[in-house]
Amino acid sequence: MNISKLNYFFTIIVLSNISFFIGANYFPDENWNSASPESQGIASSKVKKLIDLTFLDDATQGVVIIKNGVIVGEKYADSHNMLSHGTSWSMAKSYYAALIGISIEKGEIQSLDDPVVKYLDYFNDERKNITIRDLLDMSSGLEFPDHEHEKMFFQESHLDYAKSVKYEKDPGTKFEYNNANSMILGDILYVATNKKADILLEERILKPIGITDYKL
């Protein structure tokens, strides 16, 4: 597989064992090595079962299964292949989390426990005790109305919608998957770095790890 051609925005990557990142001799470059499941200590039947499960709902565009740093299983929907571009959807949440971590390492953000209001003045209301950690943990306590995901999706400005979401419960008390949290994280990154999240993603994640075939 040519990693420069692989679009991480649509491919689901299942890490059956992530410990290879620590002290491993092999790390993928432009050509990611493949191997039989058995050579990596896993049965082919289990890999096939996992792949079949991911395609049951006809919504999966592609899946890659990695064991010990090598590809042991790979399949794409009929309308896609390893060169296809797709929509990342909620993968953005993982990218936001990584970018927040990088900003902390660079000293642009002091701590996960910083209150959001330290960076965003518009949180100086009943939301003032919400922290960056609460946003990342999906426990911000921001209101989560029925069909929130659909409501945000069809707004002209997703950020403006997220800014308007009201306080509902104490932060850190309940996990509630809420897209508004991620939009607020993007705004924090902009204030801390003076760069939009898509630019940060390109500069700090995609280019450094060699991903060249993408659309933002």
Q: What is each stretch, according to the model?
A:
Residues 24-43:
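Short, compositionally biased leader-like segments
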Residues 69, 86-112, 135, 185-189:
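Active-site SXXK
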Residues 87, 100, 122-168:
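Extended ligand-binding groove/face enriched in aromatic
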Residues 1-10:
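Bacterial N-terminal signal peptides that target proteins for export
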Residues 145-216:
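Catalytic-site signature segments of enzymes, centered on catalytic residues
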